[in-house]
Each structure stands twice: as structure tokens, then as C-alpha cells.
């Protein structure tokens, strides 16, 4: 988001920058996209010994302490958009705004129930989350619907076993 502001500021000498899809308004004045470099899915991890059915998972994520990234981060902006699409407005006090590294430690220690993060599979943060025992990766069964409603979202599918073959994680192909 900072790069969007810098690109739009006529006093700033920056002429090009990397910006996460969706971080700028659809027609941001003075900014032209040159394409996408990679996919950065929205990963939501939640505390549970086993994967939960969609309704239980939604209840857990929406009624407990969830980190949605710092204000003006790409994760925060995307989470706000997804909450709005689901009719969730008003009191969002259960949604926390910690930096990713701090949120991961809080999730590991049990001080958070869920962490959502926009990043690549290879990122150190996603790799840390994948190695924490007792966490489940949330699927987005309606990923295709989100992708149709928000131009910056592209659906990706994590194939069965792609994150960890020996433990077959995820146990089914997971839309994200």
C-alpha cells in the first residue's frame, strides 16, 4: 500500500514499484499495471486438532481472536473486502492487527485462534505456519465466487498432499 501512495505522490521520485494485486483502487490515478509476478494466496490457519467442516470453521474464525494483518497491509485490505462481501461489518474487535511475525508467535502460544496472511508458499511466514502442530489450513470453498467479485483475486488450488506428502496435507485439493 505504501508503494501505491509513493507512486501517486508527484513529489516522490519513485517511478515504478511492486504492489500486491488489490492494494490500489481498481482505477488508481496515474498507476498502470505491467502484469503479475506470482500468486500470493490468502492463507488462513486456525487452531484445531482436525480439519473442521465449513460452518464450524467459519464460526471459529469469525467468533474468536483472528489476526488480519496490520492496517494498510495487503492482508488487512483483502480481509476487509472479504468480510464486507460476507455482510460482516460493525464490531470487528475480534480481528487483530498484529505484524505477521508477532501473530505467528501468538498463534503458536495460544494467544490467537487464527492467523490470515497473504504471501507465497515459499515465504518464511507460511513455512513457519505449516510446521506448527495443531494448526489447520482453511479452505475457501467459495474461492471462485470471490474471484468473480473482486478483480484482484485469482483462485488457486492446493492439490491433495502438495504441502506435505507423508502426512497427505491437505487431505483433499483445497481451493484458495
Segments predicted by a language model, with ranges:
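Short, glycine/charged-enriched secondary-structure capping and boundary segments
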Residues: 31-34, 81-83, 129-131
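Short, low-complexity, polar/charged sequence segments that are solvent-exposed and flexible
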Residues: 14, 35-38, 52-53, 85-88, ...
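Bilobed "Venus flytrap"/periplasmic-binding protein-like clamshell domains
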Residues: 1, 40-109
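Solvent-exposed coil/turn segments that connect beta secondary-structure elements
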Residues: 10, 21-24, 37-39, 47-50, ...
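Short, glycine-/small- and polar/acidic-enriched structural segments
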Residues: 1-62
Amino acid at each position: 500500500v505504501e508503494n501505491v501512495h509513493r507512486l501517486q505522490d508527484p513529489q516522490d521520485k519513485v517511478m515504478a514499484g511492486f504492489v500486491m494485486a488489490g492494494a490500489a483502487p481498481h482505477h488508481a490515478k496515474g498507476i498502470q499495471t505491467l502484469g503479475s509476478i506470482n500468486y500470493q494466496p490468502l492463507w488462513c490457519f486456525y487452531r484445531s486438532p482436525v480439519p473442521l467442516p465449513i460452518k464450524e470453521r467459519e464460526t471459529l474464525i469469525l467468533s474468536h481472536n483472528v489476526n488480519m494483518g496490520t492496517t494498510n497491509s495487503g492482508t488487512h485490505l483483502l480481509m476487509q473486502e472479504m468480510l464486507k462481501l460476507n455482510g460482516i461489518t460493525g464490531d470487528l474487535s475480534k480481528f487483530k492487527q498484529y505484524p505477521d511475525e508477532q501473530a505467528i508467535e501468538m498463534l503458536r502460544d495460544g494467544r490467537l485462534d487464527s492467523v490470515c496472511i497473504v504471501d507465497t508458499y515459499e515465504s518464511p511466514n507460511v513455512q513457519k505456519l505449516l510446521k506448527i502442530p495443531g494448526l489447520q489450513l482453511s479452505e475457501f470453498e467459495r474461492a471462485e465466487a470471490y474471484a468473480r467479485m473482486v478483480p484482484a483475486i485469482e483462485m488457486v488450488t492446493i492439490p491433495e498432499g502438495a504441502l506435505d506428502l507423508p502426512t497427505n496435507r491437505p487431505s483433499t485439493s483445497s481451493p484458495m
